[in-house]
């Protein structure tokens, strides 16, 4: 190991403080029921680093040990079985059914492993193996230029072969497998364990593992590989302090097993963009209720954002990035590129500089979304939503609506029967006040089940609905007006007819009264003018 690499190892060992002691700030935006947690620095994967690993093997004739019940004979049988299994798995076994399964799997994984698979296929060739063998003849590590022009780091693990050749075989040749040197047997078990675990992992994963275990690559080997990467000392420092992340994001690909060598490719992430600002957006559902009709919306731009070359790398899922020592380790293969103006959606969803995305629904949901330093709680309907302190019990019952609960003095939140435990991350919490965006919408005209759409499209849909309702109201008013006019005409005609009939009736009654009065008057006049008659007997 060169002095520079020794320095890196010592730096990681003695640096017990976080590499990036940043202060996190969590802002709750009341208008959109969302939280932005900022203060992280980036560690973005921009490529892969390939290493060809070669474990040297030894040919051991175990025929003479088959009749022995010794511990050594048992261990030799396990060693032989592991080598046979690896040969079956390797792409050199042309007639193997497992080979088809292996190739189908690695070819179906896409661009993430294309380079590693291509390299694994290349070093299957005897000519390439010979190049590697010659390059590492006098050292266990060397950069090898392959015939296809690719340069790779080649590492050789020969401790197992050296032990078998120099210590174990001489003993077997003298006393067969009845070796009573228990120290030698235990040492063989220890060295053999790596080969057995590598065989087990490749066998269980059809020749390709999605992580790099400490058997595939020891910590010492990993440190040596990172120390030789063509990146800055600061980048090496961050990667060496995050070995677990390096392993979880790496791959191991079986290449070949020949007479004396097991060859496989280790593909490690290369984090090329460092120390730019990163933040994460998390949101929950916000609803507006009128007469048991709901309008609900949520931001659809959740995820991680990191500055990268004048724009933002956007990772749609909050799980796309892994946090360690204040750094967000993210894979650019999972990212989208968005303009820096997208951050304006935090304070103004109607910004004209970017199409802010939301999802809509007419069905409420009560739930909680954990944030870095608290929790967003959406509480609606008849659900019980409580804030709990471990020592004091329930300290608050939440009304309907969206609420931000800081982790200060709070241990957990319960929504219905579900309990959410808050993290104990320390930082600064800020509440940005504002009228909930959802309050401006009428549940009757609110669109149902739109996912990841621009808010201007939602506005357009709402305006269309409002236009339809307005047109319907106008038609209804017109119909009512016509009915009212018809009713008025009927009323007038009826009134006129009644008046005419009343006049006629009164005229008839007047005429009759006139006739009766005239007859009475005529009779009186006649009785006065006629003389009286005397009757004689």
From Swiss-Prot:
Glycans are attached at residue 463. Residues 26-486 are extracellular. Keywords: Cleavage on pair of basic residues, Coiled coil, Disulfide bond, Fusion of virus membrane with host cell membrane, Fusion of virus membrane with host membrane, Glycoprotein, Host cell membrane, Host Golgi apparatus, Host membrane, Host-virus interaction, Membrane, Signal, Transmembrane, Transmembrane helix, Viral attachment to host cell, Viral attachment to host entry receptor, Viral envelope protein, Viral penetration into host cytoplasm, Virion, Virus entry into host cell. InterPro entries: Fusion_F0_Paramyxovir (IPR000776). The record marks 101-102 as: Cleavage. Residues 102-122 are annotated as: Fusion peptide. The chain crosses the membrane at residues 487-515. GO terms for biological process: entry receptor-mediated virion attachment to host cell; fusion of virus membrane with host plasma membrane; symbiont entry into host cell. Residues 120-174, 444-479 form a coiled coil. Residues 516-537 are cytoplasmic. SUPFAM superfamilies: Virus ectodomain (SSF58069). Disulfide bonds join 33-402, 65-177, 278-306, 287-296, 321-330, 345-356, 379-385. Residues 1-21 form the signal peptide. Pfam families: Fusion_gly. One of its GO terms (cellular component) is viral envelope. The keyword Membrane applies. Belongs to the paramyxoviruses fusion glycoprotein family. This is Fusion glycoprotein F0. It comes from Murine pneumonia virus (strain 15).
């Amino acid at each position: 190991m060169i002095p520079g690499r020794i320095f890196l190892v010592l730096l990681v060992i003695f640096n017990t403080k976080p590499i990036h002691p940043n202060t996190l700030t969590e802002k709750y935006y009341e208008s959109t029921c969302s939280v932005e947690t900022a203060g992280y620095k980036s560690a973005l994967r921009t490529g892969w680093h390939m290493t060809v690993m070669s474990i040297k093997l030894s040919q051991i004739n175990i025929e003479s040990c088959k009749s022995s019940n010794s511990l050594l004979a048992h261990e030799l049988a396990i060693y032989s079985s592991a080598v046979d299994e690896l040969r079956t798995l390797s792409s050199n076994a042309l007639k193997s059914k497992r080979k088809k399964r292996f190739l189908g799997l690695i070819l179906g994984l896409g661009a993430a492993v294309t380079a590693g698979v291509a390299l694994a296929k290349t070093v299957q060739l005897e000519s390439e193996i010979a190049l590697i063998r010659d390059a590492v003849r006098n050292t266990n590590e060397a950069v090898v230029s392959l015939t296809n022009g690719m340069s790779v780091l080649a590492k050789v693990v020969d401790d197992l072969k050296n032990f078998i050749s120099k210590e174990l075989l001489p003993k077997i040749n003298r006393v067969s497998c009845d070796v009573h040197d228990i120290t030698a047997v235990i040492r063989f078990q220890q060295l053999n364990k790596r080969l057995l675990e590598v065989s087990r992992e490749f066998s269980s994963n059809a020749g390709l593992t999605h992580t790099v275990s400490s058997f595939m690559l020891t910590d010492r080997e990993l440190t040596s590989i990172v120390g030789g990467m063509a990146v800055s000392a600061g980048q090496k420092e961050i990667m060496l302090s995050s070995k677990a992340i390096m392993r979880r994001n790496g791959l191991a690909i079986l290449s070949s097993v020949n007479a004396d060598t097991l060859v496989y490719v280790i593909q490690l992430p290369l984090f090329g963009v460092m120390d730019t600002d990163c933040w994460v957006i998390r949101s929950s559902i916000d609803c507006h209720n009128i007469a048991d009709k709901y309008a609900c919306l949520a931001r659809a731009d959740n995820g991680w954002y990191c500055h990268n070359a004048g724009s933002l790398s956007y990772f749609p899922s909050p799980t796309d990035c892994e946090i360690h020592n204040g750094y967000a380790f993210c894979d650019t293969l999972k990212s989208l590129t968005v303009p820096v103006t997208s951050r304006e959606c935090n304070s103004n969803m109607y910004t004209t500089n970017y199409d802010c995305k939301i999802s809509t629904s007419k069905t409420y949901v009560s739930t909680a979304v954990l944030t870095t330093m608290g929790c967003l709680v959406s509480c609606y309907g008849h659900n019980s939503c409580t804030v709990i302190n471990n020592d004091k019990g329930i300290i608050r019952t939440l009304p309907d609506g969206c609420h931000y609960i800081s982790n200060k003095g709070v241990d957990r939140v319960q929504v219905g029967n579900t309990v959410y435990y808050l993290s104990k991350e320390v930082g600064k919490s800020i509440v940005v006040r504002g009228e909930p965006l959802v309050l401006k919408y009428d549940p009757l005209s609110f669109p149902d089940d739109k996912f990841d759409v621009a808010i201007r499209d939602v506005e357009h849909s709402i305006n269309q609905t409002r236009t339809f309702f307005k047109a319907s109201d106008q038609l209804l008013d017109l119909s009512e007006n016509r009915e009212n006019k018809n009713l008025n005409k009927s009323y007038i005609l009826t009134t006129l007819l009644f008046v005419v009939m009343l006049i006629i009736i009164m005229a008839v009654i007047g005429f009759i009264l006139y006739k009766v009065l005239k007859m009475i008057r005529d009779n009186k006049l006649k009785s006065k003018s006629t003389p009286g008659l005397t009757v004689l007997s």
